[in-house]
């Protein structure tokens, strides 16, 4: 069974777009505008991150074992994804995980 990447692709494009907008306005003197744009970047990052790990979990469940993703933490999930060559750099994904946790609180 093939996985549908459309939602992930859309969330990554939205994140890239919001980052580009942030960089084009980051020197603006309207701090409320910068804060609002920054919040949009954070929200788009959170969405892309959530879509990413859920897709990784689905792939592992479909290709390794039906409950693989349910037996581990997200960090463990990223380690498994590295073992199966779904991601190149496990460390950066753990950093994404930590960043996601920091944006939530």
What are these regions (language model features)?
Residues 1-105:
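Solvent-exposed interaction patches of small proteins and small membrane subunits
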């Amino acid at each position: 069974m093939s996985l549908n990447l459309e939602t992930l692709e859309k969330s990554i494009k939205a994140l890239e777009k919001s980052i580009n907008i942030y960089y084009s306005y980051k020197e603006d003197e309207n701090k409320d505008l910068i804060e609002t744009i920054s919040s949009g970047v954070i929200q788009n990052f959170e969405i892309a991150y959530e879509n990413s790990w859920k897709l990784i979990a689905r792939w592992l469940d479909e290709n390794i074992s039906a409950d693989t993703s349910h037996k581990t933490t997200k960090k463990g999930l990223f380690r498994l994804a590295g073992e199966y060559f779904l991601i190149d750099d496990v460390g950066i994904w753990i950093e994404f995980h930590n960043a996601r946790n920091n944006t939530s609180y």
